[in-house]
A protein has these predicted regions:
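Basic- and aromatic-enriched surface patches that contact anionic nucleotides/nucleic acids
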Residues: 1-133, 212, 219, 224-236, ...
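C-terminal subdomains that position terminal phosphate/3'-OH groups for nucleotidyl transfer/ligation
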Residues: 110, 114-252
Length: 252
């Protein structure tokens, strides 16, 4: 209205691109002056999922934010900082075969492990909302709790890497031929399954080549397990089934 800003990013009337208010046809000026400007007010006590949904709808720029980038802004606190630390201290990116992680995929996977390992039997889809709720509830943490979470992630990740070595979190067959690189559903199956074994104080049945053969055969011959890591992977039954199969398969 004060001719401060030019129109930009128009999909309708592209010929008006760059025009300021005083340069517009009078009929366009009248439309603008008579138009109601709708605002969404987000209060401090607004439900976290509502905040996430609003920001997700507004997220329409040239480079859209990932769910984790939104989560990092909405729920930032001890937990998010700890996830960043966990990625660095565990050298998680090497397991993912990622050189740089500007979109925070690794941090999301850390949160995914923490959320599923602690509330696996209470999991409800969608997965993004499940992680959001966990992030909100654990935003602020005492030092003892932070130490516990960090220790759990690094210990179980080390178990997985020591067990499957270069095939960690990859889909492969009984001949150890890789069919696809990092699979996030297989990741949480192994991490949560191993977490349960570790919590029971039981040793793993196998490591190295024997473990690889065991997992490759499972993927190749168990159709239900294969579906659980490839189709509708965030369904409650699929999430619970795949972790339990890993627990039973690798529990000594």
């Amino acid at each position: 209205m004060k001719n401060e800003f030019p129109l930009k990013g128009l999909t309708a009337y592209p010929e008006l691109e760059g025009s300021r208010f005083h340069e517009l046809d009078p009929r366009f000026q009248r439309h603008i002056q008579n138009r109601t400007l709708r605002c969404i007010v987000i209060l401090k006590d607004t439900h976290p999922q509502v905040k996430f949904d609003v920001f997700e709808r507004l997220n329409s720029g040239a480079t859209k934010l990932t769910p984790q980038e939104l989560r990092h802004g909405l729920y930032y606190g001890d937990l998010m900082a700890l996830a960043t630390r966990a990625v660095k201290e565990s050298n998680f990116l090497s397991a993912l075969e990622i050189k740089n992680d500007k979109r925070m995929k690794a941090e999301e996977l850390v949160l995914r492990f923490w959320a599923l390992s602690e509330s696996h039997d209470k999991y409800k889809k969608p997965l993004a909302t499940f992680i959001n709720d966990y992030s909100d509830k654990n935003r602020n943490l005492p030092q003892k709790r932070k130490d516990e979470l960090l220790k759990n992630f690094t210990r179980i990740l080390t178990m997985a890497k020591d067990t499957f070595e270069e095939l960690t979190f990859k889909v492969f067959n009984s001949e150890l031929k890789v069919e696809s690189t990092f699979n996030s559903a297989l990741y949480d199956a192994i991490m949560v399954g191993f977490y349960k074994i570790d919590k029971e104080g039981v040793e793993l049945k196998a490591t190295g080549d024997k473990a690889k053969k065991l997992l490759g055969t499972l993927i190749e011959t168990d159709d239900k397990f294969r579906r659980s890591i490839s189709i509708a992977t965030s369904d409650e039954a699929q999430v619970r089934y795949r972790a339990e199969v890993i627990r039973k398969t690798f529990r000594a």
